[in-house]
UniProtKB/Swiss-Prot annotation:
It comes from the Eukaryota. Residues 234-287, 302-311, 368-414, 421-432 have a biased composition (Basic and acidic residues). This is Luc7-like protein 3. GO terms for molecular function: DNA binding; mRNA binding. Residues 234-432 are annotated as: Disordered. The keyword Phosphoprotein applies. It comes from Mus musculus. The modification N6-acetyllysine is found at residue 231. GO terms for biological process: mRNA splice site recognition; RNA splicing. The modification Phosphoserine is found at residues 3, 110, 115, 420, 425, 431. It is found in: Nucleus speckle. The modification N-acetylmethionine is found at residue 1. Residues 288-301, 312-367 have a biased composition (Basic residues).
Length: 432
């Protein structure tokens, strides 16, 4: 009844007898009523039903859904069910191994008994047969002697005795052959190395196939394969923590190396920043020094420019006054000369006036060119003063001061040239 109920539970579920409105029982895979061997793969009690190795019915729950839940859970192969299952299967294999050893021992013992038992009776029968043969030969000789002597009745009695001895000898020979045939049949047995059952050597193939496809043989074969598979899984499972620990250590070492490299990188970056800040400060100081030197040079150049411009303006005003006075004098002299020289021809006056105009134009153009050259030189000197350092500013001032006398000389020369030209022009007019 229990096995039938379990079969119905597997087919229809444990709540098969509940009404639709009744509450169903929700059993977890870790409940005590659940077969842990079934969760790990199969229940060994289901393998050997109605066989010599029957383990009896399993009273716990066998549910495929619970096994799937266990396989999907985070505690899969971590609770210890697989190790218990492996120990139970190994105990079953140890039992069948003992059975196989006992079978081999029985075969060896029976073979020894057969060999010793067959040798003993056979030897005794041979001896009896040999004794009977000797007696028969002796009796036959006696019968011949009695027949030659004419003792027929005695010879016939001995002949009957010889017949009895021959029958006894044949009986002994037949028993010996029977024992040998039985011994030969006993030697053809062997033990199955999987389930421990006795097999006949050279038996029909159908009977061999029936044995290989039987529950007992297939059950123990499945147990052996499952044991090897579980050993491999558990070995890998035990190696995984070691590997995880090793990988964790390697990861920690890598992180430490990365942190060390990061610290070194940050140290180099800080050092580089400090050096950059120092260089920037040095550049700022250099710029400040250059600005100061430029300001000093600009101040000195401006003062020198002011002095030069003042001297130039003074000279220009003086030269302008001189030119104005000369021009007035010339106009006066010309008007006087015109009044005095009315008799001269107008053409000659025109030519002379043209020559004077040309000379005055040339003089003005030369003075204009000299003024432009002087301005360009001053601009070049200002640019060079801005580029040079403050140390050379004093030398530039000296050079600018040295150049002032030259300009004065040039101005004086121009003035002298102008006066000389004016004098020449007046002389020409007077000579005319």
């Amino acid at each position: 009844m229990i096995s039938a109920a379990q079969l119905l539970d597997e087919l229809m579920g444990r709540d098969r007898n509940l009404a639709p409105d009744e509450k169903r029982s929700n059993v977890r895979w870790d409940h005590e009523s659940v077969c842990k061997y079934y969760l790990c793969g199969f229940c060994p009690a289901e393998l050997f039903t109605n066989t010599r190795s029957d383990l009896g019915p399993c009273e716990k729950i066998h549910d495929e859904n619970l096994r799937k839940q266990y396989e999907k859970s985070s505690r899969f192969m971590k609770v210890g069910y697989e190790r218990d299952f492996l120990r139970y299967l190994q105990s079953l294999l140890a039992e069948v191994e003992r059975r196989i050893r006992r079978g081999h021992a029985r075969l060896a013992l029976s073979q020894n008994q057969q060999s010793s038992g067959a040798a003993g009776p056979t030897g005794k029968n041979e001896e009896k047969i040999q004794v009977l043969t000797d007696k028969i030969d002796v009796l036959l000789q006696q019968i011949e002697e009695l027949g030659s002597e004419g003792k027929v009745e005695e010879a016939q009695g001995m002949m009957k005795l010889v017949e009895q001895l021959k029958e006894e000898r044949e009986l002994l020979r037949s028993t010996t052959s029977t024992i040998e045939s039985f011994a030969a049949q006993e030697k053809q047995m062997e033990v199955c190395e999987v389930c421990g059952a006795f097999l006949i050597v050279g038996d029909a193939q159908s009977r061999v196939d029936d044995h290989l496809m039987g529950k007992q043989h297939m059950g123990y074969a499945k147990i052996k394969a499952t044991v090897e598979e579980l050993k491999e899984k558990l070995r890998k499972r035990t190696e995984e923590p070691d590997r995880d620990e090793r990988l964790k250590k390697e990861k920690q070492e890598r992180e430490e190396r990365e942190k060390e490299r990061e610290r070194e990188r940050e140290e180099r970056e800080r050092k580089r920043r400090r050096e950059e800040e120092e260089r920037e400060k040095e550049r700022a100081r250099d710029r400040e020094r250059r600005k100061r030197s430029r300001s000093r040079s600009r101040h000195s150049s401006r003062t020198s420019d002011r002095r030069c411009s003042r001297s130039r303006d003074h000279k220009r005003s003086r030269s302008r006054d001189r030119r104005r006075s000369r021009s007035r004098d010339r106009r006066r002299s010309r008007s006087h000369d015109r009044s005095e020289r009315k008799h001269r021809s107008r053409s000659r006056d025109r030519r002379r006036s043209k020559s004077r105009d040309r000379k005055s134009y040339k003089h003005r153009s030369k003075s204009r060119d000299r003024e432009q050259d002087r301005k360009s030189k001053e601009k070049e000197k200002k640019g060079s003063d801005d580029k040079k350092s403050s140390v050379k500013s004093s030398s530039r001032e000296k050079q600018s001061e040295d150049t002032n006398p030259e300009s004065k000389e040039s101005d004086t020369k121009n003035e002298v040239n102008g006066t000389s030209e004016d004098i020449k022009s007046e002389g020409d007019t007077q000579s005319n």
